[in-house]
Amino acid sequence: MTFKHIVRIADTDLDGNKSLMFALTGIKGIGLRAARCIVNELGVDGRAKLGELDDETIEKVKKFVEEEIESLPSWLLNRRKDPYSGQDLHLLSKDVDFARMLDIERLIKMKAYRGVRHARGKKVRGQRTRSTGRKGRTVGVVRRKR
């Protein structure tokens, strides 16, 4: 059994020096709470370093994260009642970004208020826009001649 410095799970390189629970949080879409539930579901020690785990355990974790993660309780999943399929899903890595992009495109297409704000590049969540959040070059004020 050799120490693995980098372990690849769900298209993400994870640090083998971190404990299993904290290493799993390196995957986009898995936070600390989901990582803890995954570890408990598999019955693996979450404090063990990821690089020290045997190949069988790593394969077990990899299989669960990539295929069986939706067997977790629905309140833990990050995309409940998907607008396209109606199912409870848990998205990982690139799928999170892609789903977010599709949601924003859907809002823009239906001309919802949030979609209009996104399309114009304005703040979406009700923040004030008079003084903060300005983009582009700063234009100085020119003093008039006397």
Curated annotation (Swiss-Prot):
GO cellular component: cytosol; small ribosomal subunit
UniProtKB keywords: Ribonucleoprotein, Ribosomal protein, RNA-binding, rRNA-binding
Region of interest (Disordered), residue spans: 119-146
GO molecular function: rRNA binding; structural constituent of ribosome
InterPro entries: Rbsml_uS13_C, Ribosomal_uS13, Ribosomal_uS13-like_H2TH, Ribosomal_uS13_archaeal, Ribosomal_uS13_CS
GO BP terms in the entry: translation
Functional description taken from the UniProt entry: Located at the top of the head of the 30S subunit, it contacts several helices of the 16S rRNA. In the 70S ribosome it contacts the 23S rRNA (bridge B1a) and protein L5 of the 50S subunit (bridge B1b), connecting the 2 subunits; these bridges are implicated in subunit movement.
Subunit composition and interactions: Part of the 30S ribosomal subunit. Forms a loose heterodimer with protein S19. Forms two bridges to the 50S subunit in the 70S ribosome.
Family the entry assigns: Belongs to the universal ribosomal protein uS13 family.
Alphabetized PANTHER family for the sequence: 30S RIBOSOMAL PROTEIN S13/40S RIBOSOMAL PROTEIN S18, SMALL RIBOSOMAL SUBUNIT PROTEIN US13
Official protein name in the record: Small ribosomal subunit protein uS13
Organism: Archaeoglobus fulgidus (strain ATCC 49558 / DSM 4304 / JCM 9628 / NBRC 100126 / VC-16)
